[in-house]
Amino acid sequence: SVNDPETMAADAINAIQRGYDCLKIKVGVNPKLDIDRLAAVRKAVGDDVCIRIDANTAWEPKEAVRILNGMQEKGLQIELVEQPVKAHDLEGLKYVTENSYVPVLADESVFSPEDAVKIMQMRAADLVNIKLMKCGGLYNALKIVAAAGVYGVEGMVG
């Protein structure tokens, strides 16, 4: 959930105590507050816990790069950012991938094996998220996995 920094830090500690070693945090509405939340969570859980962020298509490409690089400069150690720009803005996605220190995961941009291949050919993302429901089932998911192997792009099922 998206709460104030203190609540999010407490929630993060709770998740770690329950055995989680990687956290996914929604971002995208208020960059300053996002950074404050992430800083509180990072301070609470330490450096050994992975933090991933999901912008849910909230940013414009240049804004995404500025925000993500700012997060890295503050030492927040973000493992990856999920879908920082609009789903169909593959050039924007590529811009973020090429100019950010944070690895980019394409999610909402991947609806089919053809979408995934286009993203991989363009090098528009570092990783692709494969969702069975969204891509049309197991057969299409396996096509995406095969393409990821060919293009050297990491796939994630989620």
Where do the PLM segments sit?
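Catalytic core of soluble alpha/beta enzymes
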Residues: I25-G158
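Catalytic domains of carbohydrate-active enzymes, especially glycoside hydrolases
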Residues: N14-K26
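Active-site beta->alpha loop and helix N-cap motifs at the rims of alpha/beta catalytic domains
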Residues: S1-A10, N14, P31, I35
